[in-house]
């Protein structure tokens, strides 16, 4: 496995290193993505593909009276996220679980927000996964997607060759899959300079 495969599923020492790199490397994208939504401080949040846990920290800062759950299918990511958010976990404000987005291990309609930062590239069967996100969201809940690659930059295709199972989607492809999964109001934001996209979908 080449080192960059750890972006899909961090494993071993290389995976630990990758989670730290993702925490710092994706910080600006995350900050921009959060600027496109308003957050209820009492919210229940699920961060799917939580990686190293930096976005859990960000959510906790916005949901002081709520609860944030991180989920990843990588054991390394779960462990690193738990380590970074140990205090919040002890306080009962946070938990981090191992799970697959194609079969999210939570009941229907339990979250106000679900976020996916730099992760939908690796989801198996996009529409099925979006159906699962829709299922666990409360009515009126928000699904936030943030990607550093908007599918229009040919230079980004090098990553799909380096990382097995990675697929870069355009905003039109993501919006079509969201509509198919039952999301209603869908807004798309773009940072054309950096080829970033953020999509905010309401159940």
Language-model features and meaning:
Residues 2-5, 10-23, 27, 131, ...:
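C-terminal alpha-helical "lid/dimerization" subdomain adjacent to the S-adenosyl-L-methionine
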Residues 24-43, 58:
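Conserved alpha-helix/loop element of class I SAM-dependent methyltransferases that forms part
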Residues 127-139:
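A short glycine-rich, Lys/Arg-flanked "PGG" loop and its adjoining helix->strand segment in the class I
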Residues 44-103:
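Class I SAM-dependent methyltransferase SAM/SAH-binding core
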């Amino acid at each position: 496995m080449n080192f960059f495969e750890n972006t899909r599923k961090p494993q071993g020492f290389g995976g630990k290193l990758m989670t730290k790199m993702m925490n710092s490397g994706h910080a600006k994208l995350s900050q921009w993505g959060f600027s496109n939504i308003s957050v209820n401080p009492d919210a229940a949040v699920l961060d799917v593909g939580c990686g190293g846990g930096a976005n859990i920290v960000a959510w906790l800062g916005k949901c002081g009276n709520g609860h944030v759950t991180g989920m990843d299918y990588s054991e390394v990511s779960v462990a690193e996220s738990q380590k970074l958010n140990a205090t919040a976990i002890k306080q009962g404000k946070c938990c981090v679980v191992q799970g697959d987005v194609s079969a999210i291990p939570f009941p229907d309609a339990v979250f106000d927000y679900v976020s996916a930062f730099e992760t939908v590239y690796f989801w198996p069967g996009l529409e099925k996964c979006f159906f699962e996100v829709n299922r666990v969201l409360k009515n009126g809940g928000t699904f936030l997607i943030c990607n550093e690659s908007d599918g229009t930059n040919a230079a980004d295709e090098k990553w799909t060759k380096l990382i097995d199972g990675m697929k870069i989607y355009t905003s039109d492809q993501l919006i079509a899959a969201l509509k198919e999964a039952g999301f209603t109001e869908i807004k798309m934001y773009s940072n054309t300079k950096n080829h970033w996209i953020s999509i905010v979908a309401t159940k």
